[in-house]
């Protein structure tokens, strides 16, 4: 009897913690994430049997998570160009990144228009995001960073706050 109780308890524990381990499952969609792998296939449906529609070769590219299938095994995403499809959940990271859109983004030493410009980033540059508040985010590109207006980036909402 004790053995069966231990097995049952273990099964319940695994069942309750599995979504927490996946991480992505617990969030309400849509939300921003990024591609974790250097090569990642987008598919037309949530299984390896569906054909690949795109091969991404850019780790940290920001994506918008639209749906989660099979407890996080498959994630429906949208890329910065608006293309939608499915990726394996293991290829998606919670790491927040942004992509410079439109014109050159000015990175400043403080989150305000009067801040000194310390770097400039061209359209298409991807960087890590942090400290987002009141329409500004700290944008780090391989150790060189500064504050940029969130509306110059794809991968963060202008009203969003990040630590």
State where each predicted segment sits.
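Repetitive helical segments and hydrophobic/amphipathic motifs
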Residues: 13-15
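N-terminal signal peptide c-region/cleavage motif recognized by signal peptidases
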Residues: 17-19
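SH3-family beta-barrel domains
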Residues: 21-44, 55-59, 66-71, 75-111, ...
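Beta-strand-rich domains and repeat architectures in extracellular enzymes and scaffolds
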Residues: 51-52
